[in-house]
Amino acid sequence: MQASNWMTPRERVRAYFRAGRPVHLPVDPTGPGPGEAFPFALLPGDPERVERIAAHLENPRIIGRNREFTVAVGTYRGCGVTVCSTGIGGPSTEIAVLELAALGVHTLIRTGGTGALDARIPPGSLIINHAMMRDSGPVDAYAPPTYPAAAHPEVVAALTAAAEELGFAYTCGIGATTASYYQGQGRAILPGGDEHLARFRHLGIINLEMEAATLLALASLLGLRAGVVLGVHINRALDRWDDAYEATQDKVIRVALEAVRRLGRGGAAASKTAGGTSRRV
């Protein structure tokens, strides 16, 4: 079946499914899985992270594994949650977002790690990006370079409120998604690599990663809600690493799931508590 002009974007993705199944995600649409029953998706990069997130859910179930994609479902305080790994980078993230959208997922939150560029952001804290700079990637096939990669305000509000409630330090700001881990993030292999990092800092970019802009831009184009919460595992300005990687990732997971709970009950507005420490830069 080929996509037609009268179809919605989600229907067009489904038109490319094989025998009703996604081309890449290990999901059987005829059984319980991503969609109406589990419409909130958490998107870690690492497939091994899926089981760690699933451990926080009620009645978790691994749906399947295929290449970089591991998919699980469960519930969190009454909200149906899908967990789907994306692998590293934009192309595999594009696949995950489009196929989840075609299955009926309506809210997606990237959970993972990042490197901070601002010396004021400590390793082990969290970053909630309200927008990302697109530094090339698969979104270029869908929209011009001027099209923004912005998080949905309801998801940003839910994430910040969750971090406040849990008492976790976090920073809000604009990050950058790169298509290159080494040269593109200033880990110079060839001459000129250092210029990338200087450019990001000049623009006020607070962190670098490789998937979020693809998620945010595609979600906007598809009419979905999306957001980003990341653990800071290195501060590039200080060359200081996070000594508690797993504990930081657990904070990311807890914030994302509490945000899902808030979004699921329709109460995404940030509540003021005495817990978290926030900074906008």
PLM features: what roles do these ranges have?
Residues R236-V281:
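His/Asp/Glu-rich mid-to-C-terminal helical/loop segments that flank catalytic regions of hydrolases
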Residues A158-L166, L218, V255-L263:
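Generic non-transmembrane alpha-helical segments
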Residues Q2-A158:
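Metabolite-binding pocket within alpha/beta catalytic cores that recognizes anionic/polar moieties
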Residues A213-A244:
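Zn-dependent metallopeptidase/amidohydrolase metal-coordination segment
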Residues A101-A102, R201, S220:
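Non-catalytic positions within long, well-ordered alpha-helices that form the structural scaffold/packing
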Residues H106-T107, I206, R225:
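Short acidic/polar active-site loop segments enriched in Thr and Asp
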Residues A149-G204:
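Active-site rim beta-loop-alpha module in soluble metabolic enzymes
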